[in-house]
């Protein structure tokens, strides 16, 4: 039974001035008999995606028996889709990028089970751009969040596919032959 009156995930209240509840992620899938995966958006608190003391901008694994959770990915902006092919042992995640740069990411299942955090780069790397209105309001945003087009050159995992302009990516599913 997953529902419990006890908290299994605790909030971190060090959000920044750009907090916005519509970048919330929120996909849940079953990983195995004891674990589920949950995507959590960055809520426009970009700096928290790289902060391992925060759950914003992460995918977490929650043990349904113990309610314990672990971060399995960091550097996510707004993960919308998760698809786990149990037969072929691969996990695909879809994510909204900023002003373009929607991504399809491959997540290493073995690293999830070995408790290795996989980092996808947000807000340091992205194929997308800062929204023009944000740049107008804060011209120094590139100093804090540069959005390098390469992920791998900065120590992050490259998406297997990115879309510019944005396609408004959401859930991902497998279609039969």
Would you name each region that the model predicts?
Residues 2-30:
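Asp-box/WD-like beta-propeller blade repeats and closely related beta-sheet repeat scaffolds
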Residues 14-17, 41, 45:
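A broad detector of the eukaryotic-type serine/threonine protein kinase catalytic domain
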Residues 34-37, 89-90:
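Generic structural signal for coil-to-beta-strand starts
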